[in-house]
Amino acid sequence: MLKFLKNLLDDNAREIKRLTARVEEINSLEPQMQKLSDEELRAKTGEFKERIARGESLDELLPEAFAVVREASRRVLGMRHFDVQLMGGIVLHEGKIAEMKTGEGKTLVATLPAYLNALTGRGVHIVTVNDYLARRDAEWMGKIYKFLGLSVGLVVHGMDYAEKKAAYLADITYGTNNEFGFDYLRDNMAIHPDQVVQRELYYAIIDEVDSILIDEARTPLIISGEAEKSTDLYYTFAKIVKQLVPGEDYTVDEKAHAVMPTEAGIHKVEKMLGIQNLYADEHMELTHHLNAALKAQALMKRDRDYVVKDGQVIIVDEFTGRLMFGRRYSDGLHQAIEAKEGVKIEQETQTLATITFQNYFRMYEKLAGMTGTAETEENEFRKIYNLSVVVIPTHKPMIRKDLPDVIFKTEKAKFKAIVEEVARRHQTGQPILIGTISIEKSEMLSEMLKKRGIPHQVLNAKYHEKEAEIVAQAGRLGAVTIATNMAGRGTDILLGGNPEFLALQELRKMGKTPEDDPELYRELLAKYKKITDEEHKKVVELGGLHIIGTERHESRRIDNQLRGRAGRQGDPGSSQFFISLEDDLMRLFGSDNIAGLMDRLGLDEDTPIEHPLITRSIETAQKRVENRNFEIRKHVLEYDNVMNQQRELIYSQRRRVLFGEDVLTFVHQMIEAVVERAVDTYCPDGVHPEEWDLKGLLEYAHNVFLPNHQLTPEDLADTGKKALVEFLVEKAKEYYKKREEELGGEQLRELERYVILRVVDEKWMDHLDAMDQLREGIGLRAYGQKDPLVEYKIESVEMFNNMIAAIQEDVVRYLMRLSVVRQPETRRVRRVVENRYQEEGPKKPYRREQKIGRNDPCPCGSGKKYKKCCGRNG
């Protein structure tokens, strides 16, 4: 391990040495750039583009391009890139992760590689964690790009197609990870080329890369539609599980985040429902409801996992503490929580399209990222994303003091001690930032501080609109701020306060903006600058910002992020964690020896302990959890890779159809595939030709690819299998040619595209559901001494092939039955295509001699029952 670390440090030192040489090259160009007029500096952009067109590489252009951006930034924003920021920019351009400590100006660093790569004209995406940061950075850094003649776009929630399309066509586009991912999924559900907004995925720079690629790696982006199911059962089961006794009727495994009913519990539920066997086939839906209700009751905690706001259950992001509007738990869990809380149950949803961040961002040709804490997860970045981490030195030496952890026996004693520590430091005027792991804990601590008469600000997911403003002032004299986890990430805490925010606040009270009255804004800024400068001196004398962690997170990286809020850019600062043996990490993963040690020492509740054994035990517990989480993410990726290959295949074919790449060829290929499969089914290999089911084949042909044919079994007799396929394919294509003459080529091409896209989307949706069910049950194969992943791969390929066959069959059936459709009738055709298919499995040929029952599938091929389709007026 030590050898590995030594190599790692040596590698990083070598990397810094290499980067220093390039930085010197950029610095040597600075005097030359300073002599240029604004017009001459701006003209450099056109010159660089011409040089790229002539074959010059971006690496060759880098020193000059970076020097141009640095000079533009100095003129436009009054901010000159430091040497360490230039290093960060080079690392990002090379498709790596730059670890830069909090306050080192990551936002400004991104302008360097963004400008250089945007010169190709292929578009650069800068990805942030929330809408506020995306807007702020697009507006703030956008001034540099616009000065240099590049366009800037912004992609946030709630924009329409035209706005998004324009934003993606810009040279540099800012947006959130969610929006980029959802736009990709929406593009792959588009029915018309005009609805597609994204260009190719060329280069992405991810801010807070650890948050997006690691913390959210297991969170899939899902676009869903409503499924037609009643919600009554959720209320029924919410009442039932409230009557069950924990430990007696069900068991909870907090480590595995699982809950299981016991035999006694199952009997109790059966009695309440008045049924004999809950696990009988016909009660499968009931077991699903019971499991969801138990999870909602026993595992999901209000104000920790979710909040109830305006009659809605809203998920809380466990890593940032932010509310995740629009996100819902899947598999009925969200509905079960709604029933538990007694709010209106939203319709259960069906997945229409899904992708994980892991797979979305791996599609970019070049990927880079920035964060203050990546080193602890370097292994994961390299293994999963093929991204190496370079630790960039700080501009000024770090002088923050990280004090040893203080451990208490109970949570009550811990919070009591925290309040005492806050009161002691607050008396001196030192600013304090307290990090909590949940909304519930932050509100509890807030109540305790209120009772002590300590004024403070609470920053949690419930008030994230005020996030940046509160965080920006957390460094003021006497400020006490409670923040859940990493809420407010991306906003610097300036010692003494942020004069710009204070000036803006006062302007807002007057109902004005800086654009309305620039003179007044400048006056206010000068006034507050004087105040904050005075406060800055006092705060520095008091030791800077003090961080109090109320609990160790299961990831060391999150703890480091909290600590990193203090001691920015050479400022003084300090940090300390207060821990109790009742904290989740200690309870679930800590050693039992610690409680024993405290008992042996005869310590009472209020006496803290600082002991090397305990510090080691905490670190061991964190490493254990980190390794477990890495294994889970790796495991998720292995399964998702199977799905990803299928998604890429479906989406690439879908795009070809969407953009009209010879759709007729697609249709012909589908006809050939359908005919070949039909001949294989009715005339199997190894069966004598005299025993072939030619009658069945012709009935199937009539139903699918040759409606109204006049062929008889005798016409097909004495023909070899290959010749039979060729004969039927030719007949089907001839028939389709007639359809084209009747309808007109242009109208048919439009309908072909529409039918193919709709059928593909329908079948893909069903396939996603089936794959989810397969994945949920596949773990049981391990009991049969089989590798679940291998089994999953085998079965998913079979399911995928079946889906492709079903797509081909349905498309051919619909297109063959499109007799002359006049313009006003197009909507009816679309309704037929959009209708959900009710039949599962291979569709049986329609037999002409049979009487059609009212509940039989309609022979027109719509998939509806006869009584609801052509037989409606019969």
From Swiss-Prot:
Biological process (GO), any one: protein transport by the Sec complex
Segments of skewed composition (Basic and acidic residues): 839-854
Cofactor binding, per record: May bind 1 zinc ion per subunit.
Keywords attached to this entry: ATP-binding, Cell membrane, Cytoplasm, Membrane, Metal-binding, Nucleotide-binding, Protein transport, Translocase, Translocation, Transport, Zinc
Protein name: Protein translocase subunit SecA
Residues annotated as binding Zn(2+): 858, 860, 869-870
Cellular component terms per the entry's GO annotation: cell envelope Sec protein transport complex; cytosol; plasma membrane
Co-factor requirement: Zn(2+)
